[in-house]
Amino acid sequence: MLTKFETKSNRVKGLSFHPRRPWILASLHSGVIQMWDYRMGTLLDRFDEHDGPVRGVHFHATQPLFVSGGDDYKIKVWNYKTHRCLFTLHGHLDYIRTVQFHHECPWIVSASDDQTIRIWNWQSRTCVAVLTGHNHYVMCASFHPKEDLVVSASLDQTVRVWDISALRKKSVSPADDILRLTQMNTDLFGGVDAVVKYVLEGHDRGVNWASFHPTLPLIVSGADDRQVKIWRMNDTKAWEVDTLRGHMNNVSCVMFHAKQDIIVSNSEDKSIRIWDATKRTGIQTFRREHDRFWILSAHPEMNLLAAGHDSGMIVFKLERERPAFSVSGDTVFYVKDRFLRFFEFTTQKEVQLAPIRRPGSVSLNQSPKTLSYSPTENAVLICSDVDGGSYELYIVPKDSAGRADYLQDAKKGAGGSAVFVARNRFAVLEKSSNQVLVRNLKNEIVKKSPLPIATDAIYYAGTGSLLCKAEDRVTIFDLQQRLILGELQAPSVKYVVWSSDMESVALLSKHAVVIANKKLVHRCTLHETIRVKSGAWDENGVFIYTTLNHIKYCLPNGDSGIIKTLDVPIYITRVIGNNIFCLDRDGKNKLVTVDASEYIFKLALLRKRYDHVMSMIKNSQLCGQAVISYLQQKGFPEVALHFVKDEKTRFNLALESGNIQIAVASAKEIDDKDHWYRLGIEALRQGNVGIVEYAYQRTKNFERLAFLYLITGYMDKVGFMCKIAGQNNNLMGQFHNALYLGDAMKRVEILENAGQLPLAYITATTHGLTEIADRLAAELGENIPSLPEGKARSLLIPPAPLTASGDWPLLRVMRGIFEGGLDATGKAELEEDDEAAGADWGDEGLDIVDASEAMANGGDGFDAEEGEANEEDGEEGGWDLEDLELLPEAETPKNAGNARSAVFVAPPPGMPVSLIWTQKSSLAGEHAAAGNFDTAMRLLSRQLGIKNFAPLKPLFLDLHMGSHSYLHALATAPIIPVAVEKGWSESASPNVRGPPALVFTFPQMEDRLKAAYKATTDGKFPEALRQFLSILHTIPLIVVDSRREVDEVKELIEIVREYVLGLRMELKRKELRDDVNRQQELAAYFTNCKLQRVHMRLVLGSAMGLCYKQKNFATAEHFARMLLENNPNEAQARRARQVQQQCSGKKDSSELNYDYRNPFVVCGATYVPIYRGQKDVSCPYCGSRFVPSIEGQLCTICELAVVGADASGLVCSPTQLR
């Protein structure tokens, strides 16, 4: 007996399985009817309207109904969906023993102690037939599953079979008066619609139960004479076939098994007995210690039985239904119907290999339990519980599909479990001595090894290793070294599933899944409330497993979820993509197609494959609260926003991710005071003053709103709030606002209107308002309050704000987790001295005078015309900054060149050195040095997407010539070229060839960078651009020695790219004469480039002056603030502070396509901003970003690569190729 579910309750007298759902009804002697979910082990509902014991209960086959009959003489029909009794049928005059629905007609049959059987129409709620004939209690009555028959058992020692075919023939309803007459005759005389067909006599005492065979013309009955009798019937008669003896007390219930040729009976002798219906002998007996059995019920579809006893009920199976199988590569071997079969996953072809020997005993649970397969020898080990545990070894010939001529060679032995451990070796567990016997394919023992723990079962764990299962843990045991390789606490493991690479293992127990690595290092544990049945690993390293009613997944970090709900249990054999191959309980191969997008999505998040995540968001149909909750728990609320439609959920996620814009939109839709309040708190945390103001206005929170205006410097709005408080008669709010404003007159007026004349007098006196104070003193008369003496009076006015603050600058969070970027810092740092800036870093003629002088002259101090300052400075490309002294010219950097001497090396015999260079290397610079320009260009095209090689031609020639030395011999002899190797020495072996010596090195690039920095500082923009481009063109051809230098080269590319972009924009700006707004935009974009601090100060000063001249004061103030944050010199700081003071609180006169609060990059071709979250394409070499329309065109920054081309990346070191 395999117990599936058990309850503890009062005596169970009636049981009924639901035909489709995993439910069972139990009627108790206490009068309660319980409805249980036997899969989950939970009580779903209880019904307790009966008065006294309920002995019969039955589910309807198709409708949401069940019927019950009790000792209160009532039959009740219930609707379990609405949890109520629909109606009650009255008619029986004594206890009702059993009730049952008909499988087709709207009938209920009931048996009662009033010696009658009644058939009811539950739709018309009337009794349609009364079957009389028994002369004692009728203990049970049931319909035939197919024919129009009823069988009944009575304590009058008979079993009767009734013919009810006449009832079915009544297809037309009679008239009402005839119906009433028929009903009267039925009650008095029993009617003629049901007649006795057979009376079966043979029991010596009262018969307690009788039931039909599902398909054969057989009846089985059980009685108080402790016997079970089998009866056969035909069209004319019925007779006794055999008697089964063995029970020691009254037989309570007996039935035929629906799927097996057995009879199940239970008795008051506290036992359940299983009988062979063919041989008519006892097979097995299950006993309880204290509980008598009363009722049996069988599931109409599944192999489940239930038995009710004195203290509850038990749901059980007689035999295991899990097929024995083993997966090997693309094939699964399994046993079905006593045949060994295999199934190919790719072709879905099933082949029957050979029959399996039948067990000699007739007991239950003799089917194969486990199967192990050796692919090299085509050998199969099948283990079962026959004779206390045994195995059979079959060597399957390659061409033996279905033949049995080899069965004489099947080898058998005793053992708890057996498994292959090598190509031609298998291990057998000998439980009695706790050792493993290693046998060969001739079934001969070749080795014995004691086990380190008390082992219940063994499993394969790699060649030469076993996974030994004890009661509370598992260990991996090496049979050769006799060592424990790993141990893990995992109680009651039933199945072990290894991944295809043997790197991970899943240990399945009854209610848990434990994931570990190959050394049994624990990774995660999942606990399930219902039974775990099987599992398999998919190609992504996710474990897919099944429970009784679900297919579920387990990620490497322990996160799990449901993939699909199952109607019946399955056993997974293989997972390929969205296809799950499995075996059902009948041994049939099935293919279940599932949607794996949820766990693939979570796996991509876990492995930080954000590109894959974004692709799935755009293309997949991911939805559901589970995905949203998962993203929220894992810290990705901004991603969860993509899936949410409900506004309240969107609002919560938006607040959590800091996305104020979406939160505002959702709050407008919800329009609830609490949501506006929460929005205000989050907006205040982010410094978004506008949204805080809006939220306070929507909630009419005037006190907070007034204080917000105070701390942000909007004093005019504080005055407006004071007026609103007056209109609302809010004296306290009005007084607070007057305090914020420092308006003493207003405060005196408010206090006087409020009747607080002494306070008004004190306020007026303190602030020197003598006229008002005198008037108030006259009104107060003798009640004038005294003021403290000896204390100097002071004017109590709050400090006036210098400028009104706006929103705090914030990074936008949209898709932020999917965009990575590193801030590059310069390798060659520049001195922090910007006094040498050339005059072309102009402030656009900005002439700022002292503020006090400006006020004295009655102007604003900003009247100088553009181009008026330093016009005499006509230096080409100068910065035009006034009062700036240039430092002395820095020394021209020395050209590093190749420091090593080019020593003549005589060419050795054999392959030319230049050919050896190209065969050994995948570096473009070395191929160019060898003269193999074609392969060098192909390498650069594949690695960096370069298509324009014109700028590289002179560099190729320099590399080739620089890596060779040319020996002039006699005048008539040709010049002899000699390859120059890097690091050559006289002691070097003549057979070892080093790489070519290259004329371009990384230190050279650093020197060129310093020269380009100086040209930039001097304002020689065309010269600086030429030098930066020279560096950018040379980098693909240099070779460095270490990974660290590779990173420095990549860092150098980013630095040069930023300067090239900025200088191109500056030169473009100088070409524009008429478009003033575009000039300001280009100057603003230049400030977004990552520059050295000395250059950033110059760029900010230039942009600040240009915006100020065009009256874009807010933007100019922003640049002034940034300039002050970049440690300017004294003159720059003074100029910036003056601009900040003059622009404070003012707005821009024109709108620019520039938002400094929103992170962006500048398109290298169109010079427009690409804000965070917008689509772009990039250059595969320099990494410059472009709008999508530029894709396929030549990069305007490096002038080499094609924008958007596929490339593998820069390769400039041999260490990248190892």
Swiss-Prot record:
One of its GO terms (cellular component) is Golgi membrane. GO terms for biological process: endoplasmic reticulum to Golgi vesicle-mediated transport; intra-Golgi vesicle-mediated transport; intracellular protein transport; retrograde vesicle-mediated transport, Golgi to endoplasmic reticulum. The keyword Metal-binding does not apply. InterPro entries: Beta-prop_COPA/B_2nd (IPR006692), Coatomer_alpha_WD-assoc_reg (IPR047312), Coatomer_asu (IPR016391), Coatomer_asu_C (IPR010714), Coatomer_complex_subunit (IPR050844), G-protein_beta_WD-40_rep (IPR020472), TPR_COPA_B (IPR056176), WD40/YVTN_repeat-like_dom_sf (IPR015943). It is a peripheral membrane protein. Residues 855-876 are annotated as: Disordered. It comes from the Eukaryota. PANTHER family: COATOMER, COATOMER SUBUNIT ALPHA. The coatomer is a cytosolic protein complex that binds to dilysine motifs and reversibly associates with Golgi non-clathrin-coated vesicles, which further mediate biosynthetic protein transport from the ER, via the Golgi up to the trans Golgi network. Coatomer complex is required for budding from Golgi membranes, and is essential for the retrograde Golgi-to-ER transport of dilysine-tagged proteins. This is Coatomer subunit alpha-2. It comes from Oryza sativa subsp. japonica. The lineage of its organism: Eukaryota, Viridiplantae, Streptophyta, Embryophyta, Tracheophyta.
